[in-house]
Amino acid sequence: GAGEVLCYDGMTGRYFKSSVEAIKKAQNEINHSLMHSGPESLSAFYGLIGLPATSMSDELGWNSNELMDITFSTTMSPEGEPCIAIDFARAPIPHYFRTY
């Protein structure tokens, strides 16, 4: 897509092409769902940004107690290419579908 740059997912160590705007849009969609529909998995977020789910990402997520909060920084790829690094201010949790 337009404006895509190399990005790095700190949670899984994967590189992908996206933009800050697209990642923020995905975060907003997840948080909207958390507030109106219920728990969301890390895999759902990865799907929105074009990354395949992992066995770990199916087991982790957020619920309405804690909204998803992405932090952005910069890093270098192993090839020396600058990229946007994403991480989570509040890490996704196991058993996220429980709200007690």
Where are these regions (language model features)?
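Long, helix-rich, hydrophobic modules that act as membrane-proximal anchors or helical bundle/coiled-coil regulators
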Residues: 1-100
